[in-house]
Amino acid sequence: RKAILKQIKAALVPHLRAEEKIVYNGIYAVKDKEAKQDSAEGYMEHQLAEKMLVTLEHIDNAMSPEFSAGSKVLKEMVEHHVEEEESNVWKDVKNHFSSEQRVEMNKRFLARKKQVEPAAA
């Protein structure tokens, strides 16, 4: 279970950080109160997910009820976050950025994610 947690963290943290830097900061810069709210909510959800990862790392017994419960909470948080992104954040991106801007944003996201990966492991 700890090995799986390490893999989850190695995949999730670079994604979170790149998304915050490129997507959420981009959305937050537009003049749309609702889009800014969506961006702020996403950022807060990222912070909570990272805190849960740290909490799980500090539980010595990966077979304990605490580790199982924490893993379940993390899973539910990530699922909720993905649903919010699909219904709100990506709508905001589509509404406020041209196709060319979205392509550029994706390139910057992927580049940023690669920069974060070594530090997140």
Descriptions of predicted regions:
Residues 1-121:
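Small-residue-biased structural context
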